[in-house]
Amino acid sequence: MTNLPSIFVPLVGLVFPAMAMASLFLYLQKNKIF
């Protein structure tokens, strides 16, 4: 259980920005700003 934060923290650090970028991309695609 001691190694859980060392794995979980970088995972959240990568997944959270990726989800933010994906949601922004879908938002722009839906509104046809491109």
From Swiss-Prot:
Cellular compartments per GO CC: chloroplast thylakoid membrane; photosystem I
SUPFAM superfamilies assigned to the protein according to its UniProt record, in alphabetical order: Subunit VIII of photosystem I reaction centre, PsaI
Keyword set includes Nucleotide-binding: no
Record's bilayer topology term: Single-pass membrane protein
Ranges annotated as spanning the membrane: 7-27
Keywords: Chloroplast, Membrane, Photosynthesis, Photosystem I, Plastid, Thylakoid, Transmembrane, Transmembrane helix
InterPro entries: PSI_PsaI (IPR001302), PSI_PsaI_sf (IPR036357)
GO biological process: photosynthesis
NCBIfam families named among the record's database cross-references: PS_I_psaI
Family designation: Belongs to the PsaI family.
PANTHER family assigned: PHOTOSYSTEM I REACTION CENTER SUBUNIT VIII, PTHR35775
Protein name: Photosystem I reaction center subunit VIII
Gene: psaI
